[in-house]
Amino acid sequence: LMFLFSIFVIWVHSYNVDLFSGGAQDGIWSLADRIENFVSVGLGQIAVPGFFLLSSYLFFRNFSWDKIVGKWKSRVFSVLIPYVVWNLIYYLGYMAASRFLAIRSVVGRDIIPFSVQEIWRAVSQYAYAPIFWYLYQLIFLIIVSPMIYALVKNRAIGLFWIVGLVFAVHLHLDMRHPNTDALLYYSVAAYFAVHRRGLVERSMEEEAAGWKANHGTREKKAAPEDKDGNTASVIPAHVRRRCFAEGLAGVMISVFCYRRMMAPEAAVLWTCFYRMAVPMTCWAFACGVRLPKIRPWMRQSMFLYAIHFIVVRFVNKGTAVVTRSLAGTTTAAGISLVVYFLLPAIAVIVSYILAKFLVRFLPGVWRVLSGGRKLEG
C-alpha cells in the first residue's frame, strides 16, 4: 500500500492542464481539467492520510512503554534526518538553478539568497520543498506519540479522545503542530493497533493458520513462494468472501463521503472521513487477494516521495515548452493527459535508476536519503 499511495502522491503534483491549455477553459480542456482533478483530488488526496494511518499502525503495533526510546531512535534515522537533508538539497538546488536564466522559468523562482536565515527557513518551514509538509507533521506526531498511547491505551478514554478530535475537526479547532486532521488519522490507527489488531490482521493470520492446518504442522513458518515470488498458499474462500464484503462496504462508504465532500459548502469532516475510508477499503481488498511479491522498485518509498516532485516539474514544464506552439489545441489536450497519466511511471523509473546508482556506488548517501530503507527485501 505504501507504493500505491506513493503513486497517488505523484498524481497530486502532476496536474498540468494550465501549462498546456494556453488559457482555454471550454470544450476538451474542461474535460481534461475534470479528469485530472478527479484523479488528483479524488484519489491523490487520500495518499497522505493513508501514510499517516500506516505509519501510526506500524509505530503502535506491539507497542509498550519500554519501546518508546527505541522507536524514537529509529524514527530519527528514518524520518528526521531525511527530512532535514532533503530540504537542504531542495534549497541548494533551487538556489543554484535560480542563478541560471535558461532554467529559471522552469523552477519558477527569482534569485534565491544564500544565508543562514534562508537555510533555517528551508528546514523549519519546508519553504523550498512543500511536499515535505507530511514528514513535518509526522515528526510532531512521533514526538507526541507517548501522549497518544496514554490516551488510546484505555478503550473508553481512547474512543472519547477520537470523538473529541472529530468534533475539533468539524469545528475547525485547528492546530499546526500537528494539524488536527493529521492527529485524528494517527490516533485512529493507533487505537486499531492497540485494541483491534486482530480485526486488522485477521485475514493474514487465518491464511497462515489454514496453510499450517492443510500441511499438518503447527510450526510458525511462512507459506512457501512460487517461482515468481508469489505466496503459494491459497487464501481460504471464507476469508476472500469476508474481505470482499468489507471492501464493498468500504467502497459504498467512500462514495457516500466523496459525494458529501464535493457538495457546495460541505463540512470539512466529510473530507477527513473520505480520506480515512479509502485507505481502509484498499486494505480490506488487499487482505482478500494473493498479492505479488514486493519488487525492489516498489521499496523506494522515501526516495520516490522525495524526488518525484523534481521529475514531475521538469517533465511537465519541459513538455509544455517543447509543444508551446500547440497550446490550447485538441492535440495539446491529448498530450497533457498522456503526460499526466505517464508521470507516475516516469517518476518511478527515474527514481529507481538513481536509487540503484546510489546503492551501488554511494551506499552511505543512499542510507541517509532513504532513511535506512533497503531496495532488496
Question: Language-model segments: which ranges?
Answer:
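Functionally critical transmembrane alpha-helices in membrane proteins and complexes, commonly lining
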Residues: L1-R61, P82-Y83, N87
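Interfacial loop-to-helix transition and helix-capping segments at the boundaries
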Residues: I35-V48, V123-Q137, V169-V188, F256-T281, ...
